[in-house]
Amino acid sequence: VSDHLLADGQEKKKKIALNIDTKMLKIGFVGGGKMAQALARGFIRAGLSKGEMMLASCLPNDVGSIDAFKEIGSNTVFSNAPVVDYGDVLILSVKPQVVPMVLPDLKNYKKLLLSIAMGIPLASLEKALPEGTPVIRVMPNTPALVGCGATVYARGKHAGDKEAEIAEKLFSSVGLCEEVSENLIDPVTALAGSGPAYVYMMIEALADGGVKMGLMRPIAYKLAAQTVLGAGTMVRDTNTHPGQLKDDVASPAGSTITGIHYLEDHGLRSAIIGAVEAATKRCKEVSSLSEKN
């Protein structure tokens, strides 16, 4: 079923015209945290907007975010109302627990809303907005901070091809961007949203292993990070199954297959699969709580 739904999302993507109006977009951010900052920089790099064409709402004591937007030429305000009235596109970029507090500020908003708030369903957002408001739910991950994000999005019932193309063009500026059905957002969050944390643990463990075997910690971290980067690039760019790439490294009776046997014996695969499953369940719990509220 999931494969069918993913294929359905990919089919929708194929139908999107590639001639979006390329005029610069005025963009408002409700919430000016690190992800909003990363997106703003990506939009500027891609020529989709300019610093002076973006406005973000921040808490008065969030000096770091205020300064970050100032550095790219953007203004910040301490309330949401000016941001809601400001641009062509509004990005809801606050923590999920804050969403119920800011939605009343959007009660008259009728333009395109892109929500990156984890676990907040499209139905909850659409219910709080005027009928007909186009809403798209987006799930980026933190590597978007360095332009290597993995993002998916799902359309609300009033978001058409034009709105989907705007979302895809914006989020493609900070990495990969794909369309999926909304019921796949939770497993995507567990895999790609939480996945960097799992990989950081792997990098740390690889480095610790190197240190245990005599490497100095600085070079151990560099080698571990570069190894993960290189392996990921191989999977992405060669279109080769990761199992085949693994086999290519593992010589008969060699050190690699010996290490693989140790990992298999200690349940590495099962632990990672279980982590994605557990994180998906937690995402669904958050979504369920949001719907009740």
Please place each PLM-identified region on the residue numbering.
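NAD(P)-dependent Rossmann-like dehydrogenase/reductase catalytic/cofactor-binding core
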Residues: N19-K23, A225-N293
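NAD(P)+-binding Rossmann beta1-loop-alpha1 motif at the extreme N-terminus of oxidoreductases
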Residues: L18-F78, C148-G149, V211-K212
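Alpha-helix N-cap/start motif
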Residues: K50-G51, L122, R217, P242
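Internal alpha-helical scaffold of NAD(P)-dependent oxidoreductase catalytic cores
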Residues: S124-P134, A150-P187, Y200-D237, R282
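N-terminal amphipathic/basic-hydrophobic helices that include classical n-h-c signal peptides
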Residues: V1-K23
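A short glycine-threonine-serine/GTX helix/turn-capping micro-motif
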Residues: V188-A197, P218, K246
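Rossmann-like NAD(P)(H) cofactor-binding subdomain of soluble oxidoreductases
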Residues: L39, L55, D62, I72, ...
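Small-residue helix-packing motif on alpha-helices
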Residues: M54, V83, M216-L223, L245, ...
